[in-house]
Design a protein with these regions (language model features):
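Flexible "arm" and connector segments at domain edges
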Residues: 1-63, 67-91
């Protein structure tokens, strides 16, 4: 799983500099941190709604969306995935 997340992190960091008309990450980044944070919030709510509805497939899909958008936000904050994982290890 870590390899998948590290690959995603690398892709997100590369695409932040891409043409916004060609990359969702670049388009979202161009809209600013507030919009990225809003997307994280939306995906979190959608994940909770799916969970409360006992919608397993929905919860999986929304969790993937949540992780993706959280990683876009972390990249915008210049926080490496390793830093978050290290914090989890400390806990």
């Amino acid at each position: 799983m870590r390899a998948t997340l590290f690959d995603l992190e690398r892709t997100i960091r590369q695409r932040r500099q891409a043409d916004p008309s060609q990359s969702y990450v670049a388009k979202l980044t161009a809209k600013g941190r507030g919009k990225i944070a809003q997307k994280v919030g939306e995906e979190a709510v959608e994940t909770v709604i799916a969970a409360m509805a006992s919608d397993r497939d929905g919860a999986i899909g929304e969790s993937a969306n949540l992780l993706f958008h959280l990683m876009v936000l972390l990249a915008d904050l210049d926080i490496a995935l390793d830093e978050v994982l290290d914090e989890l290890d400390r806990r």
